[in-house]
Curated annotation (Swiss-Prot):
Cited function: S-adenosyl-L-methionine-dependent methyltransferase that acts as a component of the wyosine derivatives biosynthesis pathway.
Name of the protein in its database record: tRNA(Phe) 7-((3-amino-3-carboxypropyl)-4-demethylwyosine(37)-N(4))-methyltransferase 2
HAMAP family with a match to the protein in the record: TYW3_archaea (MF_00266)
Enzyme Commission code: 2.1.1.282
Organism (species): Pyrococcus horikoshii (strain ATCC 700860 / DSM 12428 / JCM 9974 / NBRC 100139 / OT-3)
Top-level taxon: Archaea
Length: 206
């Protein structure tokens, strides 16, 4: 499948350039090694502080800080010093995986294990002749902190919000081992993709 070849090449080069979240590299390699499915954009979960020019203006927003691990109060305070214009939010988001399946049967399999692994917002839809499964959790947190460079939240409240955000991030990440185990089961059923083995050897040299 041409689309999978392109996706694999992109993934392997991103791994070489250290542009992939390190704690999900093994899981992404596992998913992409399975016949009939592959990933597109994915994230291991993140917490950070986002500045938006106005509500919903995501294309123009910018992260003052964004990490894929628990964030410290000191990191947040330093990042807030860079706030200039727009609304300021603390955001915590769970892991998310976009998995393309060749057939509806494969899409249903991926959808089922996403739900079974605790990712309750897992959905899938048809796109042209393929099916896109979004494996997504419920651990989202958005907290307003200020506007136009002015921080309204007190240090005490900021510490509290960061603590909750970190706990939600860790809760989302705690489901990753179960998701990996379930993809191992799918691999036993669908088999390993020879294209994956070939490109992995050529690009990653392993």
């Amino acid at each position: 499948m041409k689309a999978k070849r392109e996706a694999l090449i992109s993934l392997f080069h991103a791994i070489k350039e250290e542009k992939v979240d390190s704690d999900i590299i093994d899981l992404l390699l596992l998913i992409n090694s399975i016949k009939g499915i592959y990933t597109t954009s994915s994230c291991s979960g993140r917490i950070g502080i986002l500045e938006e020019p106005s509500l919903g203006a995501k294309p123009l927003s910018r992260w003052l800080i964004k990490v894929h691990r628990p964030m410290s109060f000191e990191e947040a305070r330093d990042a807030l010093k860079r706030a200039r214009e727009g609304l300021i939010f603390l955001k915590s988001q769970p892991p998310i995986f976009h998995v393309v399946a060749e057939t509806i049967e494969n899409a249903k399999l991926v959808h089922e294990i996403g739900l079974a692994s605790g990712f309750k917002y897992t959905t899938f839809k048809a796109i042209s002749s393929r099916f896109l499964v979004e494996i997504n959790g419920t651990e989202y947190l958005t907290v307003p902190l200020g506007k136009d460079g002015r921080i309204i939240a007190s240090d005490e409240y900021l510490k509290f919000a960061i603590s909750i955000g970190n706990k939600m991030l860790e809760r989302g990440k705690s489901k990753l081992p179960r998701l990996r185990d379930n993809f191992e089961k799918i691999k036993k059923k669908l088999g390993e993709d020879p294209l994956f083995i070939q490109l992995k050897r050529e690009i990653l040299e392993i």
